[in-house]
Amino acid sequence: PIWSEEQLESEKKVVINEIYEKEDEVTLEKIYDKAIWRKNPLKRGILGSEENVKGFTVDDLVGYKKEIFSKNNVTLVITGAIDEEKSREIFEEFGKIKINEGVERKEKVEVIKGRQFKREPDVKLKNFASWNIVDVQLSFDVDLTKIKENELLFLNSIIGGGDGSYLQTEIRENQGLVYDIYSCVDIFSKESILSIIFSIDKSRLQLSILEIIKILKQLKNIISKKDVDRNMAFFTENLWYWAEETKELNFQLGSDFLNDKEVLTIEDRIMANERIDFQRMREISEMIFRKENMSLIVIGPTKGITENKLRELLYGKYDNEYNEKD
């Protein structure tokens, strides 16, 4: 081993101090991850836990390094100003490099197992009395075996991906409830989370949730061809910007390959997006925005608000609506 046990112990102290610092930080994302992922490893920080860091040895570290950095566990993605022949030469030369040959990676664990997306809905509060406003994240589970990734990204753009989206127009501009509100997606192999994120005065929290739910309920009837046309450029001609600076394209191709997804060229992506229509957007909005897919995380000055009150607000009044058949 390159490191001695003494050197490793010294490095562990640095990492553990960083873990302490991260644990002291209060973020919506941390609370959200714990609430959504529960026992799944995705709820943990990238640094791991103090217990795990203290527990491994130099031999453990070297073994793991060999397992990860091995010839059977390498993906090389090349994009940019390079022709096919030169790419082939690079791949051939790269293939000759001996990187821990014969070391097999252990079977990969599924990111999400079992009933993760058939769980009971969650409402979580975290009180910080000194804050002026509450941070809110309303999230919905998405099954990517039923909804394509590009369809989800397109729907996200329509809902809250930018100016002109339904949430920005109604919640921020028309009603003036929030300074900013947006939606985003976290994508994994076969699952995704679509989240609506905003900050608001506590006195307006319940009203904002009601208004957002009202919009989400209406999407299955109001998404129009105009909405699709307005967003289409972002998913077709704008993709050619990837060819000017190919870092994002490179990352996307590598990510798709590692997640066992179809690896698409820019032309393929444009063609797939051009097939999206408003009827499909209505259909998947009805599939996603349902009671059983929903979680709510609120942090800030939450005194006087209870999880039961928010559950009643979310799952009670709109129970029949969210239990409609697909």
Where would I find each of the regions flagged by the language model?
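Charge-rich, well-structured scaffold segments of protease-associated domains
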Residues: 1-106, 142-143, 173-326
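Short amphipathic alpha-helix segments
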Residues: 166-174
